[in-house]
Amino acid sequence: MKNSLFLIKDFISKETLSGLILFVVTVLAVTIANSDFGSYYFELFSTQLGINFGQLNASMSLLHWINDVLMAIFFLVVGLEIKREMLIGELSSVKKASFPIIAAIGGMIVPAILYISLNPDHITGFGVPMATDIAFALGILMLLGNKVNPAIKLFLVTLAVVDDLGAIVVVAIFYTNELHFEYFLYAFAVYSIIWFLNYKNVQKLTPYIILGVFLWIFIHKTGIHSTIAGVLLAFAIPLNKKADLEESVENLSVDNPLVKLEHALHNFSAFIIMPLFAFANAGVIIDFSNVIEHQLIVLGVALGLIIGKPIGIFSFTYLATKLKISVKPENVTWNDIFAVGFLGGIGFTMSIFISHLAFSDQTIVGAVKLGIFASSVIAAIIGSVLLILKAKKVEP
């Protein structure tokens, strides 16, 4: 279990730094997009890039290569983290898992309801306020330093892991284009082979990765968003639960392909993919007339993130404990839960990602992005103030 805690601390430290980098990159992208260099910025990410290999011809804009290919690697890392937590971490038992699972469910359902109540004619955007940007949220906690109880950080991480799983399910079910069933058969065949390797306890990562590339291609062709391939591959990577978890993390990595792959990709995901995604997607022209034109959509997203998230997380967990369905973690107060609920309202990169899937009209996407930025900042400020005030009360 020591190694499990070590992995969580390592995850927190990397995601925290990544969150700070994302903030800088976001400011840079918005600044460039609204400067004299804005046209070059948008032209860059509209550039068509292609691969021609035999019968394989793939051509997409640079933006789509980032959002479809690199984000599949990001979701591969997310999937690895989810599987690890479910097998040896904070989600490995019903007692441990129930509280953050219920918190995440509340933090997804209430924002979605608030959004839909305001936008019955643009219902596809309901997934935008459901998401949480774990890197940004942990970055805020890091800036607060020792004012934050370590137990709060652990709760936020486990909450975000479940939230990510929920986002994956939402993307797979609700943001799927026209389906091509013949490619489902190809994808199923490849995925069956991957699981056969897992069944045979094949420890080398190379065959999993090669087959994972084909899995991505076929899922991309099915009409399901191709990032789902990353999650499916992650769930099939073996993790040796019987390994001695008291050993050093280096030995654990050698014995466990899942941990080895997670460590190999985490820095690339946190410090290359996510900043690149933020830079490519955060550049939006600040046009308040556009926001006014789509004010109900923007308001639905804002209310979902700023109000829906904390109310959903707090009310669902409070009710669950009163009904004895779950138990609140030790050393975490209800004030902490409420404050973390606001940090859960920092949607940022994940909300931006879903906004591109939810809306085809780029003017709506631009307005929604501004709403996401403003809402995430407000939620971060409120959550931070609540945690600081709570810390001052407990100081001698």
UniProtKB/Swiss-Prot annotation:
**Quick one: signal sequence residues?**
none
Compartment(s) of residence = Cell inner membrane
Protein's UniProt keywords contain Lipid metabolism: no
* InterPro entries found in the cross-reference section: Na/H_antiporter_dom_sf, NhaA
A Pfam family recorded for this sequence = Na_H_antiport_1
Q: Where are the transmembrane segments?
A: 17-37, 62-82, 98-118, 125-145, 154-174, 179-199, 209-229, 268-288, 296-316, 337-357, 368-388
Protein name in UniProt = Na(+)/H(+) antiporter NhaA 2
Organism annotation = Aliarcobacter butzleri (strain RM4018) (Arcobacter butzleri)
